């Protein structure tokens, strides 16, 4: 049972990090890959959910993850 809770906790952490973008794909190119490119002003993409909408789900998952860690350690 404890190993299942540990596995579920790790999965939730990975899901939260992918959702918030820390493990997601970067939108910027690596520096120095193309020396002939010109610098232009790029507008941010308007796709995806806003951070206000994601805040509720992320806080819920954070508290659920914390509770699972406490149950695992007890």
Curated annotation (Swiss-Prot):
One of its GO terms (biological process) is response to bacterium. Residues 26-47 are annotated as: Disordered. It is found in: Cell membrane. Keywords: Cell membrane, Glycoprotein, GPI-anchor, Lipoprotein, Membrane, Signal. Residues 1-23 form the signal peptide. Residues 48-74 form a propeptide. Residues 26-42 have a biased composition (Low complexity). A lipid is attached at residue 47 (GPI-anchor amidated serine). GO terms for cellular component: plasma membrane; side of membrane; sperm midpiece. Glycans are attached at residue 36. It comes from the Eukaryota. Expressed on lymphohematopoietic tissues, including thymus, spleen, and bone marrow, but not in liver, kidney, and brain. It is a lipid-anchor; GPI-anchor. The keyword Acetylation does not apply. May play a role in carrying and orienting carbohydrate, as well as having a more specific role. This is CAMPATH-1 antigen. It comes from Mus musculus.
């Amino acid at each position: 049972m404890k190993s299942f809770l540990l596995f579920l906790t790790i999965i939730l952490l990975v899901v939260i990090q992918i959702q918030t973008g820390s493990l997601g794909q970067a939108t910027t190119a690596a520096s120095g890959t193309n020396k002939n490119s010109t610098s232009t002003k790029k507008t941010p993409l308007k796709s995806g959910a806003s951070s206000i909408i994601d805040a509720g789900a992320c806080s819920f998952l954070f508290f659920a993850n914390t509770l699972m860690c406490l149950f695992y350690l007890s």
